[in-house]
Protein backbone atom coordinates (compact mmCIF):
# COMPACT_ATOMS: atom_id res chain seq x y z
CA UNK A 1 0.00 0.00 0.00
CA UNK A 2 1.20 3.46 -0.85
CA UNK A 3 1.15 5.73 2.21
CA UNK A 4 2.40 8.95 0.66
CA UNK A 5 0.94 10.65 -2.38
CA UNK A 6 2.19 13.99 -3.68
CA UNK A 7 -0.18 16.87 -3.15
CA UNK A 8 -2.10 17.55 -6.33
CA UNK A 9 -2.05 21.04 -7.79
CA UNK A 10 -4.93 23.27 -6.81
CA UNK A 11 -8.08 22.84 -8.90
CA UNK A 12 -10.20 25.47 -7.27
CA UNK A 13 -10.70 27.48 -4.15
CA UNK A 14 -10.26 25.49 -0.97
CA UNK A 15 -11.79 26.98 2.16
CA UNK A 16 -9.20 28.36 4.56
CA UNK A 17 -11.13 27.48 7.68
CA UNK A 18 -13.79 25.21 9.09
CA UNK A 19 -16.56 26.53 11.33
CA UNK A 20 -16.56 25.17 14.88
CA UNK A 21 -19.30 25.80 17.42
CA UNK A 22 -18.45 25.76 21.12
CA UNK A 23 -20.47 26.20 24.28
CA UNK A 24 -18.95 28.48 26.92
CA UNK A 25 -20.08 29.28 30.41
CA UNK A 26 -21.45 32.76 30.99
CA UNK A 27 -18.57 33.79 33.23
CA UNK A 28 -15.94 32.65 30.69
CA UNK A 29 -17.80 34.49 27.96
CA UNK A 30 -17.96 37.57 30.17
CA UNK A 31 -14.20 37.46 30.69
CA UNK A 32 -13.68 37.27 26.93
CA UNK A 33 -16.04 40.18 26.34
CA UNK A 34 -14.21 42.21 29.01
CA UNK A 35 -10.85 41.63 27.30
CA UNK A 36 -12.38 42.54 23.93
CA UNK A 37 -13.95 45.72 25.31
CA UNK A 38 -10.60 46.72 26.84
CA UNK A 39 -8.87 46.33 23.48
CA UNK A 40 -6.79 43.22 24.22
CA UNK A 41 -8.50 41.44 21.30
CA UNK A 42 -10.41 42.68 18.26
CA UNK A 43 -13.38 40.39 18.93
CA UNK A 44 -14.34 37.03 20.44
CA UNK A 45 -13.02 35.15 17.42
CA UNK A 46 -9.63 36.86 17.75
CA UNK A 47 -9.46 35.78 21.40
CA UNK A 48 -10.41 32.18 20.65
CA UNK A 49 -7.99 31.87 17.72
CA UNK A 50 -5.17 33.35 19.83
CA UNK A 51 -5.93 30.97 22.69
CA UNK A 52 -5.93 27.98 20.34
CA UNK A 53 -2.65 29.04 18.69
CA UNK A 54 -1.04 29.49 22.12
CA UNK A 55 -2.12 25.99 23.18
CA UNK A 56 -0.91 24.46 19.92
CA UNK A 57 2.44 26.22 20.36
CA UNK A 58 2.70 24.92 23.92
CA UNK A 59 2.03 21.35 22.71
CA UNK A 60 4.10 21.62 19.51
CA UNK A 61 6.74 19.03 20.44
CA UNK A 62 4.13 16.41 21.32
CA UNK A 63 2.21 17.13 18.10
CA UNK A 64 5.36 16.74 15.98
CA UNK A 65 6.15 13.40 17.60
CA UNK A 66 2.63 12.06 17.00
CA UNK A 67 2.60 13.31 13.38
CA UNK A 68 5.88 11.47 12.73
CA UNK A 69 4.81 8.30 14.57
CA UNK A 70 1.46 8.07 12.78
CA UNK A 71 2.98 9.09 9.42
CA UNK A 72 0.46 11.89 8.90
CA UNK A 73 0.58 14.35 6.01
CA UNK A 74 0.50 17.82 7.54
CA UNK A 75 -1.57 20.42 5.70
CA UNK A 76 -3.68 19.94 2.58
CA UNK A 77 -3.90 16.74 0.55
CA UNK A 78 -6.12 16.63 -2.55
CA UNK A 79 -7.08 13.65 -4.65
CA UNK A 80 -8.49 14.00 -8.14
CA UNK A 81 -9.78 11.51 -10.65
CA UNK A 82 -6.47 11.39 -12.57
CA UNK A 83 -4.45 10.61 -9.41
CA UNK A 84 -6.83 7.85 -8.33
CA UNK A 85 -6.95 6.37 -11.83
CA UNK A 86 -3.13 6.22 -11.75
CA UNK A 87 -3.30 4.41 -8.39
CA UNK A 88 -5.83 1.97 -9.89
CA UNK A 89 -3.65 1.38 -12.98
CA UNK A 90 -0.68 0.63 -10.71
CA UNK A 91 -2.77 -1.92 -8.80
CA UNK A 92 -2.23 -0.09 -5.53
CA UNK A 93 -4.46 1.33 -2.81
CA UNK A 94 -4.04 4.39 -0.61
CA UNK A 95 -4.10 4.85 3.12
CA UNK A 96 -4.99 8.51 3.55
CA UNK A 97 -3.60 9.96 6.79
CA UNK A 98 -3.89 13.73 7.11
CA UNK A 99 -3.63 16.31 9.85
CA UNK A 100 -5.34 19.28 8.22
CA UNK A 101 -7.60 18.97 5.18
CA UNK A 102 -8.06 15.94 2.94
CA UNK A 103 -10.09 16.67 -0.17
CA UNK A 104 -11.42 14.38 -2.89
CA UNK A 105 -12.43 16.28 -6.02
CA UNK A 106 -16.05 16.26 -7.16
CA UNK A 107 -15.12 14.50 -10.43
CA UNK A 108 -14.15 11.31 -8.54
CA UNK A 109 -16.83 8.61 -8.89
CA UNK A 110 -17.69 6.71 -5.69
CA UNK A 111 -16.66 3.37 -7.23
CA UNK A 112 -13.17 4.71 -8.06
CA UNK A 113 -12.73 6.04 -4.53
CA UNK A 114 -13.91 2.76 -3.04
CA UNK A 115 -11.53 0.72 -5.21
CA UNK A 116 -8.43 2.86 -4.64
CA UNK A 117 -8.75 4.09 -1.04
CA UNK A 118 -8.17 1.46 1.64
CA UNK A 119 -8.60 3.76 4.64
CA UNK A 120 -9.10 7.39 5.60
CA UNK A 121 -7.93 8.96 8.84
CA UNK A 122 -8.26 12.74 8.96
CA UNK A 123 -7.60 14.91 11.96
CA UNK A 124 -9.16 18.15 10.79
CA UNK A 125 -11.59 18.22 7.88
CA UNK A 126 -12.49 15.81 5.08
CA UNK A 127 -14.17 17.26 1.98
CA UNK A 128 -15.73 14.95 -0.59
CA UNK A 129 -19.08 14.52 -2.27
CA UNK A 130 -21.81 12.87 -0.22
CA UNK A 131 -21.66 9.84 -2.54
CA UNK A 132 -17.89 9.41 -2.07
CA UNK A 133 -18.21 9.82 1.71
CA UNK A 134 -20.93 7.14 1.70
CA UNK A 135 -18.75 4.81 -0.38
CA UNK A 136 -15.86 5.24 2.07
CA UNK A 137 -17.95 5.23 5.26
CA UNK A 138 -16.66 1.87 6.48
CA UNK A 139 -13.04 2.90 5.90
CA UNK A 140 -13.05 6.20 7.76
CA UNK A 141 -11.44 6.25 11.18
Q: Residue spans of the language-model regions?
A:
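Short, basic amphipathic alpha-helical segments that act as recognition/interaction helices
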Residues: 2-13, 30-31, 42-66
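Short amphipathic alpha-helix starts
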Residues: 17-34
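Short helix-capping/hinge SLiMs at alpha-helix to coil transitions
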Residues: 38-39
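Short, positively charged interaction helices/loops
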Residues: 57-91
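Detector for repetitive beta-architecture
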Residues: 71, 76, 95, 101, ...
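Extracellular beta-strand scaffolds
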Residues: 78, 83-85, 102, 108-110, ...
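Compositionally biased, non-globular sequence tracts
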Residues: 136-141
Amino acid sequence: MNNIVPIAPSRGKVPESEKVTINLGFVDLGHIDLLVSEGFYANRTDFIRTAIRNQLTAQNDAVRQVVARKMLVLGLQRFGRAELEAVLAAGETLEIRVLGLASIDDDVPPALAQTTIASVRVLGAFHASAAVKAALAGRMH
